Amino acid sequence: MKQLTEYNRVSGYLNKILALLNETYFENALSKPVITIQSTPRAYGHVTVGKVWDSDGERRHELNIGAGTLTRPIENIVATMLHEMVHLYNLQRGVQDCSRGGTYHNTKFRDEATKRDLLIEHHKTYGWTLTTPTDNLIMWCLDRDLIEIQVNRNEGYNLPPSTGGKNGTPTITPTTGKAKKIGRAHV
């Protein structure tokens, strides 16, 4: 089996996963964002409110996966990506799913995320943002033979501890969902 140890291959692999998630959980309704792999202190990923990338004359959102978080179990990477895709889905429909400068995830976010095989728990500061994959999402990953990513940036900081699964799943690290500020707001 090939191993994901090269950055360029990881980028392509994340695009493949995004396409599979878009098909399964959004009926291909999401506009394709540009996937980036950058440092995201205190977060596993983010999506931009604005369309900050130009690609072949088309403006596109950015969906970032934290460079220092790539060696988490693949189901956690998938849960982070799906979390950010829910923000994109809500954004495309004009649904405000965050407040307090884009940091507090409200029940509109929670409701859409739980429809898509994510377990969403409440955080006292950031709202409905603590994200773990459900058993169904873990099975989705297994059914598609998704493999672990084996390249990671050493960021020198620690992310929040795991909340663990509530439905018999292994203890898994949560997605904070906090994003960097882009323009006037952030998700």
Predicted regions and their residues:
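Active-site recognition of the HExxH zinc-binding catalytic motif
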Residues: A79-Q92
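Metalloprotease/metallohydrolase-associated module, dominated by Zn2+-dependent proteases
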Residues: K2-L63, A67-T71, Q92-R184
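Short basic-aromatic helix/loop recognition motifs at nucleic-acid
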Residues: N76-T80, C98-G101
